[in-house]
Amino acid sequence: MPHLPPLGLPARRRLAGALCALFATATAHAGGWETVSASRTYNTIPVESDDTVNPLRGYHRWQNQELVPQAAPALDAFRRYHWRDLESVQGQYTFGAILADLKAARDQGRKYAFRLRMMAGYDDGQLYAPAYLAGNASCLHGCGFWADSGAASGKTWVPDWNDPFVLARSRALLQALAQAIAASGNGASIAWIDVGLYGQYGEWAMRKSVYANRPAGIEEAGTDTRRAIAQMHFEAFPDQQFVMFIPYANRDALHYALLEQTITSKPVGLRADCLAQAGYFRQWTDHPDDWRQFADQWRKAPFVAEFCPFDSGQAGPATARAQASEFHISSVGNANFALSKPDNQRWLSLSEPEQHDMLMLGREAGYRYGVDSTWVSLTADGQLTLAATFRNSGNAPTYEPWKVRLEIVDAGGVARWSASVPVGLNSLAGGAVTTSVQSSWRVPALAAGSYALRLIARDTRPADGQQRHPLAWVLSERDADGGLTLLNLRSR
């Protein structure tokens, strides 16, 4: 603070001294900041009208389809592949379809999820495993058998899941795919991988009827086999996000994947293949002690799902919406319903209440991050303080490495200064939970002009073209890129 002249001096000398003092003050502040002390509150978009599209929440693109109307294309896409299309001759792999889909997702600003399958239909007479596998002499009992599982005229080829050769070739397939994806340079564009291969559609479920007349020596998949199939996925892709199918019969494999193994760098999530089927989750709620082991896995790894075809009664959108809410499901495939209709008629075939439930499911599933309030203080010499309260009004957290940044942005949109705000979005599990933080920084002098002070959540992964776009706050005041301008600053 400048020293003013003593009051006892003559008036002319006191005036001259005061002018000198004021000049000294202005000089001290030259190149500094205009002082600020401002508080502000923000408006969370009501869930009923929230059409925000964010990664790994709401609806994801399913088999190149997005049937429930959304405000923007999904930021995650999922597809599944038959083993026979990836390895027609033993040891000769054709991963072109997967690599092309993965690259397309990257080029479109999405991330990609997939599953490999050894079976894909009952009684259709199709062999979905490689032709070389059926009847291969390296297997103890022919690697599998043709079963008649129902009234349809065709038969179903059932692999001998326990056979060492079948397991070895499955492991080789996954290892070769991992190498091909690594060589493509697009591995960071994977959203998640289903632990697949085993079971019908690779979904870890089998009709017991197919084993009624099985050949001697062939048995249902044992617990060691199921663990081995999960393990080979993890060993091939140890740093990717996995999700695991939830049939109750696989509880031992789930225990291994979620609670025992230490191969994967990320916790393994859950996968439901029959959302909307009334009573589907009773397989777990009827066994509460068993479910208790996995019930909170959603807090640290994603729970994703796809629909069972809608039937009459309780099997439909209302049931799916309730299940997604109760079990904290983050992302649902945006297709695979009303299968009796052509693709362009499926959405229109739903009643108005059913359409409402489908829209609300997408709005409610997963995280909904916002900012309740902020207080900003900036001194002339660049001491910047932020106090902020963050909220997750969704039903689950994010599972990706977002970092909230405070940025000073010039008129051209270039961040001239930024700092990390000490808030972990992953720790805000949902249910309107909030957390408040306060931090201070010393901001350097910047060129004279006006700047925007912004809060933005950015993907912390390497900037190699595979980063997510900034997370969009669910706030009425948010900017076009999803960030939030708190106020304008002025450097002198």
Question: What name fits each language-model region?
Answer:
Residues 32-165, 293-349:
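N-terminal substrate-binding region of glycoside hydrolase catalytic domains
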Residues 144-166, 173-215:
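Active-site groove signature of glycoside hydrolases
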